[in-house]
C-alpha cells in the first residue's frame, strides 16, 4: 500500500502554533505504528521575502546577500524553536517517534507556492501538508493564493489542515465521479478510494463514498413540453447509484457507506461531510468534466471553505506539474 515516507510541511510564519506540523507528526507516528520498519522524513519549510532588501542600491550585491542571509538565519532559529516546542507537545500524546526524521529549511523567494513546488519536485516529496487560515470573526477559511496554486500545480497530494481531530472510528469521505466512463475519471476514482482506505487503515476510521449527479435541466423541461423530468431524474439517479454500488463492491466498502445525491458537487460534499462528521474529505482536483472539473476554480474554494475538516486533494495518475519544466 502507498505510504507517505517523505512529507513537506508548509509552516505558517505568523504563529507558533503549527497545526500542519502536528498533523504531519500524527500521521507519521501512525505510519510508524502500522509499519515499524518504515522510516518517515518530515521537512518543515517556508519562504520569506522582503522587497526592501532588493531595493537597497547603496549596498553591494554581496552586502545585500549578507543581509538576506541574516534574515534567513533569524527565521531559521525561530523555526527550529517552534519545531522543538510542537514536537514536544506531540510527544506528550504517546506518538511513536522512533524512526521519524525532522528537518527544517527557510528559503528566500518572492512566490511561496513556487518555492514549495520547486522543493517538492527537486526532493521528490510524496505529500505536502499546509494549514488553513481562518477569519478572526468567522469560522470560514481564508482561501489563499498559495492554496490555490498548490491545488492546481503541485504534483503530489496536498493536505489542507483545519481544526477537526482525527478520532478513532472517525469517518473519511471520498468524493468521486462515478457517472463518467472516461478512463481518467475511473482511474482517479480508484486512486481517491485507495487513499481513503489507506488512511482509514492507519487511523482506524470508516470510509464513505459520495457522488453528486445533476438535476433535470430547467431549459429542456421548458422548451420540450413532452420531456418527462421525473423519468429523466430517476434514470440519472439509477445510473449513478448502479455505478457507485459497483465501485463500492470492488473496494469492499459497505453500500450503507455510499451517498449518491442530486445537486452541485460543493453542496452535496459539504452536506454529506457534515452529516457523517467527516474528519477528512479526499477529492480530485484535475479533470475535464464532472466532479473533478467542478472542483477547480471557485467551486474548489467553496468546498474547502465550507468543510469543517481536513481536505486531501489528489491529482490523476501521470499528472505533470507545469512547473516541472521551468
Role assignments for model-derived ranges:
Residues 63-77, 228-239:
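A short acidic, glycine-rich active-site loop
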Residues 43-45, 101-107, 159, 208-210, ...:
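General small-molecule cofactor/ligand-binding pocket signal
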Residues 129-132, 157-163, 311-315:
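Short beta-strand elements of ligand-binding domains
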Residues 1-65, 171-226, 306, 316:
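Small/aliphatic-rich secondary-structure junction motif
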Residues 145-166:
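Short, structured interface segments
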